[in-house]
């Protein structure tokens, strides 16, 4: 099946792409929703649906994968927050509809790779959009054990770094910029102590993927800065803002059903 992957830049959307390919599907394009460039606080958009931290590096992510990238600016807000979503003009979900509608027209995809693990809110809305467009959502991580998933991601050579923290026990000065393999023991410890979701499904942290077996080049962070979003004494919210990045060549093979062709479509 020809598949487009919804990506945030994080580990989950990346690992779900790997699962799609393992299942015999072909990733032919990437799709991403981003905040408006002139929007105040655009690095960390208050959205129920989308991860926006790290969005400045998404173009480089697509270049690393050598795949076409479709990006749409998020124009809507979270208006219909009921359990069952229905089409609602001005809702941010309709931005996803317009994005995937274009991707389907341009790339003739039949399925959408989705990295959802636990959020019914996100799953229901993605399924609503896919049903309206006659697309098949592919969510191989859905309701998987999070400790198992994190272990698999690390053993599958997904190199992702923590770019946002927002939970008790996560310190911006200590943990931002750390990689998954460096954080795994501590995340498991936090899960046992405070009930933190090991994969960050409660919004405890977010990641950005620097390398994985699907990348033809790896992303190198040359410089970044810490931005404090909320200086809570017990659970401060902070994120990394990338300042300089570049791609570095790597010697690796990609699966036979993985085809590459890079261009970016913004609207």
Curated annotation (Swiss-Prot):
Pathway: Protein modification; peptidyl-diphthamide biosynthesis. It comes from the Eukaryota. It holds the Pfam family Diphthami_syn_2. GO terms for cellular component: cytosol. GO terms for molecular function: ATP binding; diphthine-ammonia ligase activity. GO terms for biological process: protein histidyl modification to diphthamide. Its EC number is 6.3.1.14. InterPro entries: Diphthami_syn_dom, DPH6/MJ0570, Rossmann-like_a/b/a_fold. It catalyses: diphthine-[translation elongation factor 2] + NH4(+) + ATP = diphthamide-[translation elongation factor 2] + AMP + diphosphate + H(+). The modification Phosphotyrosine is found at residue 97. Keywords: ATP-binding, Ligase, Nucleotide-binding, Phosphoprotein. When transfected in S.cerevisiae, able to restore diphthamide biosynthesis in a strain lacking DPH6. Belongs to the Diphthine--ammonia ligase family. Amidase that may catalyze the last step of diphthamide biosynthesis using ammonium and ATP. Diphthamide biosynthesis consists in the conversion of an L-histidine residue in the translation elongation factor (EEF2) to diphthamide. This is Diphthine--ammonia ligase. The gene is DPH6.
């Amino acid at each position: 099946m020809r598949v487009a992957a919804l990506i945030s830049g994080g580990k989950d959307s990346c690992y779900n792409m790997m699962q799609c390919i393992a299942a015999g599907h072909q990733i032919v394009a990437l799709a991403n929703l981003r905040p408006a460039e002139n929007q105040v606080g655009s690095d960390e958009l208050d959205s129920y649906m989308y991860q926006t931290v790290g969005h400045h590096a998404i173009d480089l992510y697509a270049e690393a994968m050598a795949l076409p990238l479709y990006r749409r600016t998020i124009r809507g807000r979270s208006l219909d927050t009921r359990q069952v979503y229905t089409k609602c003009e001005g809702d941010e979900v309709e931005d996803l509809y317009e994005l995937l509608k274009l991707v389907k027209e341009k790339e003739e995809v039949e399925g959408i790779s989705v990295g959802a693990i636990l959020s019914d809110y996100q799953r229901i809305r993605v399924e609503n959009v896919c049903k309206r467009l006659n697309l098949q959502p592919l969510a191989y991580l859905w309701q998987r054990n999070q400790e198992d998933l994190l272990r698999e991601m690390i053993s599958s050579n997904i190199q992702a770094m923590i770019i946002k923290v927002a939970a008790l026990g996560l310190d911006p000065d200590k943990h931002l910029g750390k990689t998954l393999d460096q954080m795994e023991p501590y995340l498991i410890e936090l899960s046992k102590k405070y009930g933190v979701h090991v994969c960050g499904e409660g919004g405890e942290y977010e990641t950005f993927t620097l390398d994985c077996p699907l990348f033809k080049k790896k992303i190198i962070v040359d410089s970044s800065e810490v931005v404090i979003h909320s200086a809570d004494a017990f659970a401060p919210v902070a994120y990394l803002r990338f300042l300089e990045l570049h791609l570095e060549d790597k010697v690796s093979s990609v699966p036979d059903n993985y085809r590459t062709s890079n261009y970016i479509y913004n609207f």
